[in-house]
Amino acid sequence: ISCSLVGSEMCIRDRFGCGVDCASETELMMAYALDYKPGEIMFSSNDTPAEEYAYANEIGATINLDDITHIDFLDKILDGKFPETMSCRYNPGGYFQLGTSIMDNPGDAKYGMTHDQIIEAFKILKSKGVKHFGIHSFLASNTVSNEYYPTLAKILFELAVELRDKTGADIKFINLSGGVGVAYKPEQTPNDIAVIGEGVHKVYDEVLTPAGMGDVAIYTELGRFMLAPYGCLVTKAIHEKHIYKEYIGVDACAANLMRPAIYGAYHHITVAGKEDAPCDHKYDVTGSLCENSDKFAIDRMLPKIDMGDYLIIHDTGAHGFSMGYQYNGKLRSAELLLKENGDVQMIRRAAVSY
């Protein structure tokens, strides 16, 4: 749910048979309100408050433990009555590589259990009555490579066999989580989900099937991949500033889309009605927050922008509105849904008060 908190989008995803991964009590409440069933809700949180664990258990969400110490914490919350199915999050440490390219550094990540910890966690949970187990891991974000999932799958499939052999645990599912990204830059080659699926299938047949584990379900968290390309932030040019650089000030800001400000993330920008015009002007595109990082683009080549032009900031369907905030007292914008028949529906009103 973290990639998009819009209830109507969640209903659309439900129509295609998707479950939901939740990271907070609020997200759990949304999933429950939208009638997601217990087997369709995963609760993957960290540094989790007691009341959130209690609520997750109450609605039948599958709890994905981030740390081995949470077992005792959960034991007290649930009065020793553990659910029959639970999952544990794995962190292999070190660097995660695809070929010779370092994709991320799990050893610096706050998430998950070490190799020895997850083995011990399965043993403890089994002794407390847990009957069915899942494994979860997230090792890299927004990869634009068809090799990420198959590489991660091999790590987790081999771990699953080891856990089964060393603990006797019944492994019901392996969650490859997120990480399959989108091509934010026009020159990038998009991921091919069919190729990715075949790669995972190949590793499954090489590792799990020969081990007698050919019935293990595979879960994924493809929120960004499914939603990012299908949303955009539309903003109006309202100021032009000429100092040491050329600035275009717009009526949106990082409170509407914070990825460029906090990650330095690239989002493609087009100017409505000037899609075919030459990109021969260099601009920084800025919002009005009292932060110099409030920039949607830096030194971006764009067509000449006139006041009143609408700028289309692309690929904001995931981690756009849902990451918004209210710094400087900024209010949330409206959200519109473009339907298949061309109709436009307002799915969230603009905020009118703080």
Predicted regions and their residues:
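Conserved, mostly hydrophobic/aromatic
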Residues: 24, 56, 88, 135, ...
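Active-site loop/helix belt of alpha/beta enzymes
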Residues: 92-239, 302
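Hydrophobic, small-residue-rich alpha-helical packing segments that form membrane-like cores
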Residues: 58, 64-66, 70-107
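Short active-site loop/helix that positions an aromatic residue
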Residues: 28-34, 72-77
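Glycine-enriched alpha-helix->loop->beta-strand junction motifs that scaffold or abut catalytic
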Residues: 15-19, 35-40, 54-63, 79-85, ...
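Single conserved hydrophobic/aromatic residue that forms the stacking wall/gate
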Residues: 1-7, 11-12
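Catalytic beta/alpha-barrel core
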Residues: 17-26, 40-48, 61-69
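Charged (often Lys/Glu-rich) extended helix/loop segments that serve as interaction or gating elements
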Residues: 208, 213-354
